[in-house]
Amino acid sequence: MGYEKPQIRSTTVIGIIRDGKAALGSDGQMTLGNTVMKHSTRKIRSLYQGRFITGFAGATADALTLLDRFESKLEAYSGKLDRAAVELAKDWRTDKYLRRLEAMLAVVSTDKALIISGTGDVIEPEDGIVAIGSGSMYALAAARSLMKHTTLSAEEIVRESLQIAADICIYTNDHIVIETL
């Protein structure tokens, strides 16, 4: 029996574009193994002069490293989201150090939503909803239903989706932070 490194599990991040407006939110829980370490971790950031909001899931230090790299790519490519995401993904796949990072990013603007995965993939969901993290599938299901059957705003859908995920996923809490564009 050897020492097993505790797995960092945390979070639900969901972003939505609706009616020319975008919202991205996350819960605040950070869990190490089976212990809640923090209830109010901030996992979303506004980037590039407030034109984009990004959120992260996974190992916090890894995610912050990727977030910093992504912000640098946005600056280098004058805020061109697709180009910055693809260039980050290329680096992620080819750099020995980055390849070992365990994190994902979700990014929204008023007209585009992307997921940059832990394998270096760039995914643009066709419904304008991005969700990452341990409770992402619960939040995604809730958001899709709310988008289809209500007239709620992007921010309201994000809030309700995160609350539903928090009610189901043990790695998601109800300390919700949302930013909008």
From Swiss-Prot:
UniProt catalytic activity: ATP-dependent cleavage of peptide bonds with broad specificity
SUPFAM superfamilies the record matches: N-terminal nucleophile aminohydrolases (Ntn hydrolases)
Active site residues according to the UniProt entry: 11
Gene3D superfamilies xref list: Glutamine Phosphoribosylpyrophosphate, subunit 1, domain 1
Binding sites annotated in the UniProt record for Na(+): 166, 169, 172
Alphabetized InterPro entries for the sequence: ATP-dep_Prtase_HsIV_su (IPR022281), Ntn_hydrolases_N (IPR029055), Proteasome_sua/b (IPR001353), Proteasome_suB-type (IPR023333)
Keywords for this protein: Allosteric enzyme, Cytoplasm, Hydrolase, Metal-binding, Protease, Sodium, Threonine protease
Listed Pfam families: Proteasome
Protein name according to UniProt: ATP-dependent protease subunit HslV
The species this protein was found in: Chlorobaculum tepidum (strain ATCC 49652 / DSM 12025 / NBRC 103806 / TLS) (Chlorobium tepidum)
Gene: hslV
